[in-house]
Amino acid sequence: MRFLCLHGYAFSVEVLQQQMEPITAHLPSDWEYEFLEAGMEPTELMLPNLKQVPKPNYSWYNFPYPEDVEEAYERLAAYVESEGPFDGIWGFSQGGSMAALLLLMHQAEHPDTPYPFKMAIFTSAFLPHSFDNGVISWDLTEKNTLEPTYLPGRIDVSHGKKLDWKKDLHTSIEYDMINAVKDELDFPVDLLLRWRPSDIPEKIPVPSVHVRGLKDHYSFVDESVYELFDPEMARKMTHRGGHNFPRYNEELVHFAELIIETVVSLH
């Protein structure tokens, strides 16, 4: 098995390799793991404690400006095309979001061709952004509050209804982020919406493993990515930790069992 591994926000290949060592030690020794480093510098606007994070560190993108997300996606897709084939993709946090985006884009653009991966593994992952759902243009009112205007894309996720974009799953994460740093941004700010499981015409038919921590401090790390996938082919577990990989031996063993069961199901 050959896996393409994608790190999270303000991470690096080296840090992801270190975090994965406890779980890969429980997997077959002849499996291969290839790591791709993201291409953008993270910002303190997204991660206030960035100065405390070991360097070098990278992000796939910061705020979901359409051009930045597209650049990250195209870079990843080009790498898969040039360096593949890979048997699986393994994404942590924002890297998991990028892995899900890659599969969703394949489903949308090449529905009648084989997926680029036989399986996918997601650790502490969250929903990716969509190029089809339009953007929210956030602006500041005279009262210094954020006012959203929805500009639909190929798909109108509002279905003609008035939605509370400050709370909607498509946009609530971004609202919280830009509201926290609104005095440091230039408005208006146009940001992509996230995919929701209800947005896709059918579940992704790729065998998958989903792992998250019960103490994850990011509320948006939930079951949503799991719900993008065919439940008949998806396996999931939780562990006692937070926004990281499982650390207790019994949890590592269970994680490894889920991965191996998924690999066996491919044959």
Curated annotation (Swiss-Prot):
Gene Ontology biological-process entries: secondary metabolic process
Gene Ontology cellular component annotations, sorted alphabetically: cytoplasm; nucleus
Pathway entry: Mycotoxin biosynthesis
Keywords: Hydrolase
GO molecular function: hydrolase activity
Source superkingdom: Eukaryota
InterPro entries, per the entry: AB_hydrolase_fold (IPR029058), FSH-like_dom (IPR005645), LovG (IPR050593)
Enzyme Commission code: 3.1.-.-
Pfam families: FSH1
EC class name: hydrolase
Applied relevance: Fusaric acid is phytotoxic to plants such as cotton and banana. It has been shown to induce programmed cell death in plants. In addition to a mild toxicity to animals, fusaric acid exhibits acanthamoebicidal, antioomycete, and antimycobacterial activities.
PANTHER family assigned: ESTERASE ALNB, ESTERASE OVCA2
Family as reported in the entry's similarity comment: Belongs to the AB hydrolase 3 family.
Function: Hydrolase; part of the gene cluster that mediates the biosynthesis of fusaric acid, a mycotoxin with low to moderate toxicity to animals and humans, but with high phytotoxic properties. L-aspartate is suggested as fusaric acid amino acid precursor that is activated and further processed to O-acetyl-L-homoserine by cluster enzymes aspartate kinase FUB3 and homoserine O-acetyltransferase FUB5, as well as enzymes of the primary metabolism.
Entry protein name: Hydrolase FUB4
Source organism of the structure: Fusarium oxysporum f. sp. lycopersici (strain 4287 / CBS 123668 / FGSC 9935 / NRRL 34936)
